[in-house]
């Protein structure tokens, strides 16, 4: 399934050295849940190499649509399932690798009390008790949004939740909706909630209904600066980069050397 990016520390050093003499502008396509990890790692990468990075952020479905419409990208950070579909269409240049796992969490406005969600039943009751909630848009193939709607259906609360659910294009906007009082509770990937200082994020989520999602990183088949793109993808998989993930809400998934 995976075509491995295999880069030794020495080889990565050579890539960085080469990059300094021909800095490139790289376009990174990233899902919302991976945008903060990508930006955090990207800052260090730019400092080391002189490359400039810009980001296109969206749901897996939205990114797929833009890529299929012919938009240029150099590196893609997307769900494994989404990557599989893109790979079948030849949209990777033969290299993609497990990068991180993202998990679901809830958030309330900073200063408010988090509801009890210690069990599946407690989570269900918290959702029913909430005056309003926000999720990312299932219609845009948001992985968390699709999952949460299916979970409400499974719990038998789809109808009451429909009337008080505020849908946002991406999870980062879910956090904003909670912070500014549009919604009482936000439910999306933890990595999309944590960057917003206006919310308090749950440390846990009921294991019985948790749904970790694997994300991968790879070089786009439309990459204009292929060497620089490979260097960034490889850098994202290093132990140094993977160590940055937990503090910003995601679990490392790369096989670091």
Predicted features and spans:
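Exported/periplasmic ABC-transporter solute-binding proteins
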Residues: 4, 22-71, 78-90, 94-102, ...
């Amino acid at each position: 399934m995976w075509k491995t990016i295999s880069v030794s520390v020495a080889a990565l050093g050579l890539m960085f050295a080469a990059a300094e003499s021909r800095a490139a502008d790289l376009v990174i396509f990233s899902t919302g849940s991976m945008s903060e990890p990508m930006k955090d790692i990207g800052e260090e990468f730019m400092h080391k190499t002189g490359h400039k990075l810009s980001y296109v952020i969206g749901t897996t479905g939205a990114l797929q649509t833009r890529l299929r419409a012919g938009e240029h990208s150099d590196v893609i950070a997307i769900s494994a399932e989404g990557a599989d579909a893109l790979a079948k269409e030849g949209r990777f240049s033969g290299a993609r690798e497990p990068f991180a796992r993202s998990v679901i969490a809830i958030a309330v406005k900073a200063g408010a009390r988090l509801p009890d969600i210690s069990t599946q039943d407690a989570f269900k009751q918290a959702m029913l008790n909430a005056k309003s909630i926000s999720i990312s848009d299932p219609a845009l193939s948001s992985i968390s949004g699709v999952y949460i709607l299916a979970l409400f259906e499974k719990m038998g609360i789809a109808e009451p939740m429909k009337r008080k659910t505020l849908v946002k294009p991406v999870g980062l906007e879910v956090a904003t909706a909670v912070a500014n009082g549009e919604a009482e509770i936000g439910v999306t990937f933890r990595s999309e909630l944590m960057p917003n200082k206006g919310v308090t994020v749950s440390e846990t989520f009921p294991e019985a209904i948790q749904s970790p999602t694997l994300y991968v990183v790879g070089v786009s088949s439309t990459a204009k600066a292929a060497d620089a793109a490979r260097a960034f993808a490889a850098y994202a998989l290093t132990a140094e980069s993977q160590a940055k993930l937990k503090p910003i809400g995601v679990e490392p998934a790369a096989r670091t050397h």
